[in-house]
Amino acid sequence: DMHLELMRITRPGMTEKEVAGKLQSIAIGAGGDTSYPIILTVNGEILHTHTRDLIMQDGQLTLCDAGAETAMHYCGDLTRTIPTGKQFSSIQKDMYNIVLNAQIAAIEACKPGVLFKDIHALAATHLLEGLKNHGVIKGDPAEAVAHDVHTLFFQCGLGHMMGMDVHDMENLGEQYVGYTDELKKGTTFGWKSLRLGRALEPGFVVTVEPGLYFIPTLIDRWKAENKLAEFIDYNELEKFRNFTGIRIEDNLVITENGHRILGKHLPKTVAEIEALR
C-alpha cells in the first residue's frame, strides 16, 4: 500500500520528506510501523541515503525503498523506482527495463539448492548485457562479470535473508547467516557487500533487488585508472554519469520446488507504473 501511494501521489514540486511522511503514516495506520527508515530519494545512486530534503523535479527518477513491520514484528523490504513526473523518458525506460529483466531472471532462478551467489552473478550478467546494447559494455557480458566489471554499476548485493529483522540475524555475522564453512564471504569490492551467498533452502525468505547505480566519483576513479577498459567504453559511459540510479526489489519465500513472491501484486512494469501516474 505504501508503494501504491508513492505511485499515486508523487509529483514535481513535492519534497522527498513530504512523500516519505505520507507513506509512513500508512504503515502506522495499518497497526504496524516501517521496518526501517524509509529511503526516498531522487539521488538513487547514493545507496541507502536517509536524507530527504530535496524538492523533486520533473524529469528525475524517485527511488523508494520502504517496508512495513507487522504487529507480529515480521518485516517487509520493497523497492520501486518511478518517474517523478508522469512518464519515464526514453533512456530512463531503457535503463529501467534492464534492471527489471535482471530482476525477473534472478527471481526465476530462485529455488532450493541454487547458490544465491550464482543468482547474483546471473543478475549482474543481465545488467551488463543491457548496458552492452547501449554501447557502454564491450565483449562478453559473462566474462565481464568474471572480471568484476559489474561492480562499477552494481556495487551492492542482490539480496539478503529477511524475517523479524529486515536483515535477518545480521548481528550473528554475515559469514554465519549468509555463508557456510565451505563458502566464504567475498572480500573484493562489490562481492563483499553480498550478504547472502549460500544455497537456498525451503523456508528461506529473501529479497531480490538488482539495481544500476551511476556514481560520478566512482566512474571518474575507474576512468582515471583506465580500469577494465577492455570491457568498458568510457566515452559512452560519460553520457550516463548523471543518470542517478534504479533499484527494483521484491520479497520471496523459497518453497519445496521453487519460490513464491510474498504480498499482493505490486506494479513494476513501465506500463503499470505510468498508468498510476
Language-model segments: which ranges?
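Active-site neighborhoods and metal-handling regions in enzymes and metal-associated proteins
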Residues: D1-R277
